[in-house]
């Protein structure tokens, strides 16, 4: 058994345009109709200046979790032959689009043109 593993390429995908801290609540909404009182404190402490949301300002989803993974995999620029030679695909998320079928099964279906649902 060959136990060596090599990372040959990496890719990422971020949806839509970056959203500034000032625009956050336009995407996420207000708390009881009011701006968050702790937002400035948290943002000052975490240092994040922009972020990406997979939704519009009226909270319409633009990309699913599976879409994000599929776009990142597409970004690897693999030929169909190399893609078909993948022997193991590991996926993880803290917030799946759905529980069944699993996130990994859904990504596998999207990547290998064999949708699960």
Show the residue positions of the predicted features.
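Conserved active-site "lid/cap" helical segment
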Residues: 1-87
């Amino acid at each position: 058994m060959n136990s060596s593993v090599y990372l040959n390429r990496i890719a990422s995908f971020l949806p839509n345009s970056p959203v500034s801290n000032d625009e956050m609540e336009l995407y996420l909404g207000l708390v009881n109709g009011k701006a968050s009182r702790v937002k400035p404190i948290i943002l000052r402490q975490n240092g994040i200046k922009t972020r990406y949301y997979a939704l519009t300002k009226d909270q319409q989803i633009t990309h699913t979790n599976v879409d994000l993974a599929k776009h990142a995999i597409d970004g690897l620029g693999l030929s169909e032959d190399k893609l078909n030679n993948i022997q193991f695909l590991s996926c993880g998320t803290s917030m799946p689009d759905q529980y069944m079928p699993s996130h990994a099964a859904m990504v596998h279906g999207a990547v290998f043109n064999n949708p699960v649902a």
